Amino acid sequence: MAAKSDGRLKMKKSSDVAFTPLQNSDNSGSVQGLAPGLPSGSGAEDTEAAGGGCCPDGGGCSRCCCCCAGSGGSAGSGGSGGGGRGSGAGSAALCLRLGREQRRYSLWDCLWILAAVAVYFADVGTDIWLAVDYYLRGQRWWFGLTLFFVVLGSLSVQVFSFRWFVHDFSTEDSSTTTTSSCQQPGADCKTVVSSGSAAGEGEVRPSTPQRQASNASKSNIAATNSGSNSNGATRTSGKHRSASCSFCIWLLQSLIHILQLGQIWRYLHTIYLGIRSRQSGESGRWRFYWKMVYEYADVSMLHLLATFLESAPQLVLQLCIIVQTHSLQALQGFTAAASLVSLAWALASYQKALRDSRDDKKPISYMAVIIQFCWHFFTIAARVITFALFASVFQLYFGIFIVLHWCIMTFWIVHCETEFCITKWEEIVFDMVVGIIYIFSWFNVKEGRTRCRLFIYYFVILLENTALSALWYLYKAPQIADAFAIPALCVVFSSFLTGVVFMLMYYAFFHPNGPRFGQSPSCACDDPATAFSLPPEVATSTLRSISNNRSVASDRDQKFAERDGCVPVFQVRPTAPPTPSSRPPRIEESVIKIDLFRNRYPAWERHVLDRSLRKAILAFECSPSPPRLQYKDDALIQERLEYETTL
């Protein structure tokens, strides 16, 4: 049985669970639980696998959540599912909380995207205007440097954007082809977990965490659009593209990226998807909304790369020119201000887009984004002013310092073992780009608690700012009086302190998960069982009846697996009863044995895999306690606990 990943986790019936990792690869593993009482080749299962699922329009679920099917009385059937009607109600409540299907594209979302476009145009436009001004005044050296940073950032962004377009376009075509082949009579499209399927070394992964969800959503939508409905009718939108249509798309995208308009095109496409989600009916609204979310996550990542490859060095360059010439022109001031705003905006906007595109993260409010913007604005302002002051006196040593700091930060990022890109060399390039970001500001690249790493980073930044400012003050030019030097130093340290205060405010009052100070990593808010409330009749059921239901389902799944000629991939079994002791009695928990090596998954997918399995199986069995996952390499307890925590 070939494992095909469509990137969805859903509750197909009150006693049916399906999961596939957010990874578009033939090498990716997947998990599927067959509904008790349904043979593996039944028509009901084939209808669900074709894309009907829990979505009325058959669009499939491109989100990592649990939802209940709304057809065929599935909410009220299946006493063995552990709850009948109550189980369906509990699953519906879980779907509303985890899937966030009630979210709509609002006016604030549109204004936020338009503001991002305005910030981008202001940043790039003022840089080009200033470069032309330098050329007209005969300052060819400043003109060359200013234009170089503009071209460097733009070309880098176009390369990344076109690379992502190629990957998305090929993924949609491959998923459409796969779904079409599954629609043939007699085709076996069931998915199971196999250790060999997940252990491939050459697995293809998208470039960033949000792109994993984005590509899964796009391939899922392409696959479900080409699927059959319950009456056997084929959707028109799922047909293969003609050769002329594909050629036109390739030609259009090539021209857009050659003209350096890839980022603008993605912004316009994001607005278009948001408007479509508003105009569509209830059946298709969420599909366009989540496509908009993932597209905005992509363009936010591109904006982030552009700002730190173009705006950050541009800001340091212009401030250094101002300090050296002892004069400030209006255009230079506008350029520096636009670059600083673009840097802070890109960081805050990317964090919002990343959280919005992940179902295992709570969305961040606009007030929290504003606090994040102020945090990054003031810390980056202190950093670049320090760089400008130091570079005005020590040009050579400033270059050595930047290269040394970048090497250390890149080594630190590589040591964190990020797994965001498709190949090893792309991963190295990505780590090198993030190392450039670390020259100016903090950027989280690893799941888990960041308190220690955040403290170390800003402590190092404070030491560097102090040393560079002190060296500038001691060796500054004689014509620079203390009337200018003392206020400059005050601006540096007061700006850094203000940014740290905003950072503490964000984590203390505006973090989506609540206050982050004095909280242990195993608090109740991280427990998947608290994400929804169980029905009363289920909550009062005894552990013995639940255990009996588990054994019946396990025996039935064992019988189906042996009939299909494969060994069951994961087993749900009750643990041995605890030995008598003086400790209070523990609630019996389930152990899910998964025939996979957990460390073969990238960090972000491991987190989503664990969370999704717990939520799905907990809703499936209505157990009073979340089950425990046991991988082949379960000896790495510290690693497993590390990805249980959130930012």
From Swiss-Prot:
Location of the region described as Disordered in the Swiss-Prot/TrEMBL record: 1-44, 197-238
InterPro entries with a match to the protein in the record: XK-rel (IPR018629), XK-related_scramblase (IPR050895)
Biased composition (Polar residues): 21-31, 207-236
PANTHER family: XK-RELATED PROTEIN, XK-RELATED PROTEIN 4
UniProt key word Nucleotide-binding: no
Spans traversing the lipid bilayer: 112-132, 142-162, 245-265, 303-323, 328-348, 362-382, 393-415, 425-445, 454-474, 484-504
Pfam families referenced in this protein's UniProt entry, alphabetically: XK-related (PF09815)
GO biological process: apoptotic process
Subcellular location: Cell membrane
Activation/inhibition comment: Phospholipid scramblase activity is activated upon caspase cleavage to generate the XK-related protein 4, processed form. Does not act prior the onset of apoptosis.
Name this protein carries in UniProt: XK-related protein 4
Basic and acidic residues biased stretches: 1-15
Expression (tissue specificity): Highly expressed in expressed in the brain; weakly expressed in the spleen, thymus, uterus, blood vessels and fetus.
Keywords for this protein: Apoptosis, Cell membrane, Membrane, Phosphoprotein, Transmembrane, Transmembrane helix
Keyword match Translocase: no
Site (Cleavage): D564, G565
Family: Belongs to the XK family.
Taxonomic superkingdom: Eukaryota
Positions bearing Phosphoserine: S197
